[in-house]
From Swiss-Prot:
Keywords from the UniProt entry: Cytoplasm, Hydrolase, Magnesium, Metal-binding
Species of provenance: Mycoplasmopsis pulmonis (strain UAB CTIP)
GO cellular component: a single term: cytoplasm
Pfam families named among the record's database cross-references: Pyrophosphatase (PF00719)
UniProt keyword Hydrolase present: yes
Annotated protein name in UniProt: Inorganic pyrophosphatase
Molecular-function annotations in GO: inorganic diphosphate phosphatase activity; magnesium ion binding
Major place of residence: cytoplasm
Superkingdom of the organism of origin: Bacteria
């Protein structure tokens, strides 16, 4: 079990897609989701980890509460959702709010409601389909051990390449690690 501090970008049940802009150091509005799509979880990022899509590593925070964009909270990693977004690896760590006594019993993905896991899989498989069908692909869930390895790998990427502009990072990584991209 790993403790992390998650910076919240998007509140659970929001239809507004916010995104952290590392260059400006701010959370900005990216777009409004289409139709009745709403985020099924609080959505945040880890500022010390860079995912293969050139953005900070994403975290879905399981909680009964909604947290405002721009807030930080303590969480513990319980797994991950493997995802490809427009050809780029875009992993979502799954964590639970660590300061909520009601969630103390959740130590692994198996402790979460399977319907909630199906809901996040459906959401992330479909929320961009209006752009192009199949733009996002969710290949499944991984356990805590896998998630912690992915987090460490992304921390290493941030340390080595976090200074690069996003497009330059992706171009470099596509050559060095083609297995992380679907082109």
């Amino acid at each position: 079990m790993s403790k992390i501090v998650v910076n919240i970008e998007i509140q659970k049940d929001s239809n507004i897609k916010y995104e952290y802009d590392r260059k400006r150091g701010k959370i900005v509005v990216d777009r409004i989701l289409r139709g009745d799509f709403r985020y099924p979880a609080n959505y945040g990022y880890l500022e010390d980890a860079l995912d293969w899509d050139g953005d900070e590593l994403d975290v879905l925070v399981y909680s009964q509460e909604k947290f405002l964009p721009g807030t930080s909270l303590n969480a513990r990693i319980v797994g991950a959702m493997k995802m490809i977004d427009d050809g780029e690896t875009d992993t979502k760590l799954i964590a639970v709010h660590d300061d909520d006594y009601r969630l103390e019993n959740i130590k692994a993905l198996e402790d979460l409601d399977s319907k909630w896991l199906e809901e996040i899989k459906y959401f992330f498989s479909n929320y961009k389909n209006w752009k192009r069908p199949g733009i996002t692909k969710v290949s499944g869930f991984e356990n805590t051990s896998w998630a912690l390895k992915e987090y460490q790998e992304c921390k290493d990427l941030m340390r080595e390449y976090g200074h690069l502009p996003k497009k330059e990072f992706i171009s470099k990584m596509m050559k060095m690690h083609p297995e992380k991209y679907e082109i």
